[in-house]
């Protein structure tokens, strides 16, 4: 995971069961994945920049699909496995996350929260405190960094919940957070059975 460099550039727009996703990369590394229009998504990735994005389909029918960069193919395979409920999940693409040192410390901890597991903001703050060179880490500061996570789903900010199991916020919208946690069997009736097995068809190898 890298931590410095130039601004993100919009690259690809792809459908998902929870709405369109915008995927960005830098130097062959995944640097951003947002639900379209979500809070904290860079302005350049909103609707006015959409013509600059390459639209992808999960059936691989787009003419340029064979020429996709390796990190894009890896991201697509991971997302298909995730939304299809295929475990264990494949390896993550290489990540190029940009933020303050504190934000990077929080995001590194998010990478260690497993599928179908939730962690409170307070517990996350304690984990960050073990690596952060200050005597204490505030829960509000941690929550702010979680909300600024630039790679949705893969860097699992949706698994961070409030005290005593309260849902808490989500930059992509609370409804999406509920759906993602239900898909993983951690929220709501049916423990995710209704949402598991979302179908995406074939992806390029």
Segments and roles (model prediction):
Residues 145-147, 154:
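Major-groove DNA-recognition helix of helix-turn-helix-type DNA-binding domains
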